[in-house]
Curated annotation (Swiss-Prot):
Keyword Hydrolase: yes
Origin superkingdom: Eukaryota
Oligomeric and partner information: Monomer.
Essential cofactor(s): Mg(2+)
Organism name: Bos taurus (Bovine)
Protein name, as recorded: ADP-ribosylhydrolase ARH1
Binding site for Mg(2+) 1: 59-61, 309
The EC number(s) this enzyme carries: 3.2.2.19
Reaction equation(s) it catalyzes: N(omega)-(ADP-D-ribosyl)-L-arginyl-[protein] + H2O = ADP-D-ribose + L-arginyl-[protein]; alpha-NAD(+) + H2O = ADP-D-ribose + nicotinamide + H(+)
Any one GO molecular function term: magnesium ion binding
Residue segments, region Substrate: 106-108, 168-170, 268-270, 274-275
Entry's family note: Belongs to the ADP-ribosylglycohydrolase family.
Length: 353
């Protein structure tokens, strides 16, 4: 099992980046807000299995996910989380030098440059009511690879929140990072996906408790807390998985057009997956429906009219943890940009866990 789990760690990092590259298509598909057009173009390319990602660059999502992973590795088994936070801030700032042609989000760019990693608490930024975007969620999955054990839940909560609010200091933003990390840990532990949402609902009070204990912009955070929780509660009830036991139910038909409409309906501003609540939600919806099919996952999470590279990066990671490279066309990842770096960080995270 150990060797198999290491392989799944590798798949998690690599397929997250592969999903990102596929959903991004050098910017063409991230910003094409019509899923049916994307699926037509995909068919013209010969379908998913025919795509060779050699010239398909990864976006800001993977660059920042690698920054998170490499900061976790540099910190090692350190128990002082403030040291880790300074390293995260440094890596987030440094990775901004690798954003040419990768369409980085505004909040990530602006706030990364405000960070002062060498100063005490220089990794903190003020609360901002406009920072509910998905930039925190898209880079946090590997935190669940580093802290997968139930005994490490407090660390997972704290690190995902603080990594998130270095650039997205708003609950809708940084709680997205918590979901990305938490569901990765669930996947490592073989928890059935229909139980994940219920697990999140049980963890959110712990997250709120941490926000209060941290004593940093507590009032503002609590004032804006309910949107994220309400949206997830509504979604879990819609899919019939509020109890954490039932199988999810999907409407019929639920094809490309219907999915675009649904993704837009759960979004904050109409662009599905562009916020911290709905990027992991759309990824989760795809995981619930796709089972062990990489192609079905891609059709739902990578190729749609919303913020497709972010939902793809998150979904690709969770799916990779569960299924490894099962049924994935090698052309989708063999010549992937940064593949060696992704594999090295995955193996090192496995050793560190």
């Amino acid at each position: 099992m150990c060797g198999a789990l290491m392989e799944r760690y590798v798949a998690a990092m690599v397929l997250s980046a592969a999903g990102d590259a596929l959903g991004y298509f050098n910017g063409k598909w991230e910003f094409l807000q019509n899923g049916e057009k994307i699926h037509r173009q995909l068919a013209q390319l010969g379908g998913l299995d025919a795509i060779d990602v050699e010239r398909w660059r990864v976006s800001d999502d993977t660059v920042m996910h690698l920054a998170t992973a490499e900061a976790l590795l540099e910190a090692g088994k350190v128990s002082d989380l403030t040291h880790l936070y300074s390293l995260l801030a440094k890596h987030y700032q440094d990775c901004m030098g690798d954003m040419d042609g990768r369409a980085p989000g505004g909040a990530s760019v602006q706030n990364a440059m405000l960070l002062e990693p060498d100063k005490a608490d220089g990794w903190r930024i003020p609360f901002n009511s406009h920072e509910g975007g998905c930039g925190a969620a898209m880079r946090a999955m590997c935190i669940g690879l580093r802290f997968p054990h139930s005994s490490q839940l407090d660390s997972l909560i704290q690190v995902s929140i603080e990594s998130g609010r270095m650039t997205h200091h708003h609950p809708t933003g940084y709680l997205g990072a918590l979901v990305s990390a938490l569901f990765t840990a669930y996947a490592v532990n073989g928890k059935p996906p229909q139980q994940w949402g219920r697990g999140l609902m049980e963890v959110l009070p712990e997250a709120k408790k941490y926000i209060v204990q941290s004593g940093f912009f507590v009032e503002q955070n609590l004032q804006h807390w309910s949107y994220f929780q309400d949206q997830w509660e509504k979604y879990l009830k819609l899919r019939g998985i509020w109890d954490g036991k039932s199988a999810p139910t999907f409407p019929k038909p639920f094809d490309v057009k219907e999915r675009d409409q649904f993704y837009s309906s759960v979004s904050y501003s109409g662009w599905g997956g562009s916020s911290g609540h709905d990027a992991p939600m759309i990824a989760y919806d795809a995981i619930l429906a796709a089972g062990d099919s990489w192609k079905e996952l891609a059709h739902r999470a990578f190729f749609h009219g919303g913020d497709s590279d972010s939902t793809a990066a998150i979904a690709g990671c969770w799916w990779g943890v569960m299924y490894g490279f099962k049924g994935v066309s090698p052309s989708n990842y063999e010549k992937l940009e940064y593949r060696n770096r992704l594999e090295e960080t995955a193996r090192a995270l496995y050793s560190l866990r």
